């Protein structure tokens, strides 16, 4: 399958340490933790333009970012601290920030929050409404938050404008990831706000290209195995030749997620327990 190129959004000027107004209802405070997996850093979103606000993805354990967040909400009441998933660039600051402002942490039960969230839950505040959308794949507990007033989705790491998302087994699951892409496409959002990088302002073609990329990667893996049995790690140099080599270990994990998906489908079989070095071959 030849997929349409993904129209990545990489034009982004970072503003660290202060709240940046993005829309009438949304501000962002950017953590100074840039890197190959975080782009310019973790963007913590402040939702609401009145006295009471919600905060999404407080971010990494970083005292400077905590101070910036507290300064950004000074004079306001934080009613909810929401977390998309449990990775180290999203979750660690949730508890310290929540305790500092006297607000509950809300997240998937796997993260042991104060209040459990599930698909379809609704969180209401002063002039804003957030609906919970379960989006497993990047992580099993991944949640996204749909803001009804702007028909926008805070997409966490499920969809990022600057890069594809890592899907790393055993937590990451490619079938679940693709199913979650379908759910987001079906919702018809006007804007996606990833935790890393800028917004996706034309979501449908972007999401279609992301899905096409994943299905195309399935085909590339099958073509590689038609030549000879191989492992995810061994396939990386050919399939990710243009990608920063610092990302190759993560790329191997994403290829493993494709191999596990193809094994479920009955197309391939593993010679051992699934891992990045396990050799796979076409079935039959």
Question: Residue locations for each model-derived region?
Answer:
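C-terminal regulatory/interaction regions
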Residues: 1-4, 8, 223-284
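Glycine/proline-rich low-complexity segments that form flexible loops, beta-turns, and polyproline
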Residues: 1-12, 25, 113, 138
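Conserved beta-strand hairpin/beta-sheet module of binuclear metal-dependent hydrolase folds
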Residues: 12, 16-74, 144-156, 161
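Short, structured coil segments at secondary-structure junctions
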Residues: 22, 100-101, 188
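Residue-level signal for inorganic ion chemistry
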Residues: 25, 69, 196, 221, ...
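Metallo-beta-lactamase
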Residues: 52-55, 60-62, 129-220, 224
């Amino acid at each position: 399958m030849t997929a349409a190129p993904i129209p990545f959004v990489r034009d982004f000027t970072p503003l660290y340490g202060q709240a940046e107004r993005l829309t009438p209802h949304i501000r962002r405070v950017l953590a100074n933790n840039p890197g190959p997996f975080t782009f310019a850093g973790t963007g913590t979103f402040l939702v609401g333009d009145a006295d009471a606000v919600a905060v999404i993805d407080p971010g990494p354990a970083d005292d400077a970012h905590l101070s910036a967040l507290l300064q950004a909400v000074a004079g306001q009441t934080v009613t909810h601290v929401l977390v998309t998933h449990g990775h180290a660039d999203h979750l660690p600051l949730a508890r310290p920030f929540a305790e500092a402002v006297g607000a509950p942490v809300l997240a998937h039960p796997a993260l042991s929050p104060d209040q459990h969230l599930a698909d379809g839950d609704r969180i209401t505040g002063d002039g804003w409404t957030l609906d919970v959308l379960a989006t497993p794949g990047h992580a099993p507990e991944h949640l996204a938050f749909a803001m009804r007033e702007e028909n926008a989705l805070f997409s966490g790491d499920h969809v990022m404008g600057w890069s594809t998302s890592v899907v790393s087994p055993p937590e990451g699951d490619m079938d679940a990831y693709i199913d979650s892409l379908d759910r987001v496409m079906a919702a018809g959002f006007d804007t996606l706000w990833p935790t890393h990088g800028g917004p996706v302002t034309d979501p449908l073609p972007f999401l279609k290209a992301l899905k096409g990329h994943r299905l195309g990667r399935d085909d590339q893996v099958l073509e590689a195995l038609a030549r000879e049995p191989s492992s995810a790690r061994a396939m990386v140099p050919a399939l990710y030749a243009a990608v920063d080599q610092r990302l190759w270990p993560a790329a191997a994990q994403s290829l493993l997620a494709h191999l596990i998906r193809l094994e479920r489908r009955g197309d391939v079989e593993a010679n051992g327990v699934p891992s990045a070095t396990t050799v796979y071959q076409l079935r039959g």
